[in-house]
Structure formats: structure tokens, C-alpha cells
Amino acid sequence: MKPTSPSHAALTRRAFLGRSAGGLGAVALASLLKPDLLAAGGLPGFPNFAPRAKRIIFLFMAGGPSHVDLFDPKPKLIELDGKKIPPELLKNHQQFALIRGTPSLKGSPYKFQHHGQSGTIISELLPHLSKVADELTVIRSMHTDTNVHDPAVNFMNCGTLLGDRPTLGAWLSYGLGSENSDLPAYIVLTSGSSDGQPLLQSFWGNGFLDSRHAGVPFRNSGAPVLHLDNPPGVTTADRRRELDMIQWMNRRQSDVLGDPEIASRIASYELAFRMQASVPALAEIKDEPEHILKLCGADPAKPSFARNCLLARRLIERGVRFVQLYDRGWDSHTNIDMEHKRQCAAADQPAAALLADLKQRGLLEDTLVIWGGEFGRTPVAQVSGKTWGRDHHPHAFTMWLAGGGMKPGLTYGATDEFGYHTVENPVHVHDLHATILHQMGINHERLTFRTQGRDFRLTDVQGNVVKEILA
């Protein structure tokens, strides 16, 4: 094989890139890309119209919080507690993930009250969110297509049950680009119970889009991103020689193959180089004023949902387009009383503080905050010995949104008297996605990518903007 043949060039360059990545960690190839290629806008003509929101923080309660215990009180469940579920509720649909037989109805043991001028009804498990009730747009009529965790999380993120499609954050990065060349457009933070539902890389993947649009996970302790520091023994002169060589090889390889994934790899190196300067200071939340730390309940030294909420605000202040916080531990099949109390105690105050903090900084107006999981939980009990929980429930659940041009203080949609089915203004996940994109200035039918002979989009061939919840 001649050294100048295309296949030999590809192998040679890929091997060199692999050795460089291993030897230099994620040291960037700063000379290969112009800075504006990373901070540039997205597709021509996007946004399609003036956006109400410029950025999104998605507080994802992984596992599925119980709507009938948090936002959707059902006196009928309390009245009929212990009675078998009416058979007519179970007709013509997928029923339960794990429950077998005919289960009994289970009323919520928690008290609900009206809060704020809006009178939004919230459970006693969420006393801090109750104080910001007038900021919330509560959707009680969400529904999705599956009661299985991984496909349901994929569906909430990708608009499909499959794990090989772009996520919401990736679509936004693709359509709108990045506002900051020093940070990724899409960042993922995780917290919660270590024995919670596993988090898959597909939940923040790029699918068939360019790999630079994938979410970048930040660690919740220590260095947020590994391998940003130069390894011992690598001098500036050493790095300069390697970068010069890769630049030369990049030009040759582009001439021969024009492989777009090579450009993505180089862009990642460029971004990593810039992150060496931007990330360390960004992650130092101990620099936050004491009253802000107290407001969020955050200990700078401990990984937590509270710490991630603070970090999310710092990220969007610096132009990150989409920040997604996964909080694990909401999958309460047994001992739901203990588990939901634990999860609410960890997530309630930080979520409320995030809204208050964004508002007092003037950021809530154009930042869309989303709270919810992949589905809800059953109005019937899943009994295990002396404890009980609730199974997965895709037919009806609650999510809330705040800021970003939403109508504050509104409770939208309704479920039946058992909280089992949606009966008023149902909102499918595709509708939610269409609405989110609309607030970001995007017509969801125009944000497409052509592959495999057809145009794909986040909302597939469905989805309607829920205009009634918009301010």
C-alpha cells in the first residue's frame, strides 16, 4: 500500500489522533479551527422567529415521581383506599410494568393545599416549591408511550423509544448553535441515589447528528471534566510540535476524504483547550455568596442536586444553551413514603431556590425551567411484604415549567378521579417538545435532518404547540 493512498492516510491519521489523545489527554488542537466555528449560530434561518427563551434547564427526576402524591390530589383514592381498582380503568391499554393481578387503590397519605395568588395545589412534601407556586405552569395531563424506564427516558429526550436518535439538547445545539466558544452548548449533571435507575449515554446522545452536539457530562465531585490538565512531562514545545503535525495531517486528510467526523474530533480538541481555562473557575461554587448557598441548601464540598442547581445557573449565565440535571432515586416500587420524602427533601429547596435566584438576576424571563420524569406512578399500590410503593404509570402524570414565556400560576389539564387517565387537555410528549422548541424560536416542523432517505425531527410526524400555557 502506498503511503499516499486514501486508506493508508486514514489509518495513519486516526492512529496518530488516538496516540495524541492518549498522550495529551484532551489538550486542544487550537490552531486547527477558528474560534467562531465553535461559537457560531446553528442552521441558516434559525431561530425561525423571536424566541421567548434563550436557554433551558431541565430538572429530570429520573425514575418517575408520583403525580398523585405531589401535584394531583385525588380525594376519591382516599375514599376508596384498599378497594380493588375498577376494571373499566384497565380496558384497552398497557396496564402495569411489575404489578400482577388486580391491585388495590391507594390514596395519598400527604396533605395538599392551595398556594400563592394562583391557588396552585401542591403536596406538603414540597414546602419550598409551594412558596414559588405563582411561578409554575403545572401540566397535570402529560402522557407518554411506554411504562419501561429506558425507552421512556429516551422518549422524553428524543421523541422516540429508540436510543439512537438526537436528544432535545442535541437538536437545540444543531439548530441554534452555541453562545460560548469556551463551553459546550449542552451539559449534563447527575445526582441522587446511587442505586437509582441507571443513566445511559443515549439519554444525552447526538444520534445521527454531528458528535459535537452531544451532551457533555460534568462529574459531581472533583474535576468536572477529566483529562483537561496537561499530563506531567508534556512541555509547551512538545505540544506545539504535535499540534503542528496534526494540523498538517488534517489539511491533507480533508483534501483526500473530507470526513466530517475528523472536523468534529478537532472541534472537540479545540473546545477542550478552551475549557481548560473556563471550567475550573466555573465549578468553584464556594465563591457564591453565603446567602445564595443558604438559599439553595448547597454545601460546596458535597455533590448534590443543590450543588448542581447552582452550577446550572452559573452555566447558563455563561451562555450554555441546554443544561440537564438528572436526579436519580424516584423509582419507588416499595417504601415510597421513605423514598419520596428523601427525594423531595433533597430536590425541593434547590429547585425553588433556582427559580428565585434566576428571577432576582433577571434570568428567569428568558430561561425555561422544566421539571419532571419519564412517567408518573400508579394510583394503585404495589405491595411488597410490609411496605408498599407505586408502579410505573405512562397514562397520566404531572410536569411543571417556569420562566421562558410560560403562563405563570396556571394549572393545565386534568386526570380522572383516580389520576389514572387524562380527561382534559391531554399533553403528549411530542406536544411538550413542540412547545419547548416554540419557546426557543423554532418551528418544530422545520428543525429536520435528512438521513436514511427521509427527514427526521424531534417530534416525528406529530406534536402541537400547547398555546394555552404560553404567556
Task: Please annotate each region the language model reported.
Residues 1-471:
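Ligand-binding pockets and gating/stacking loops
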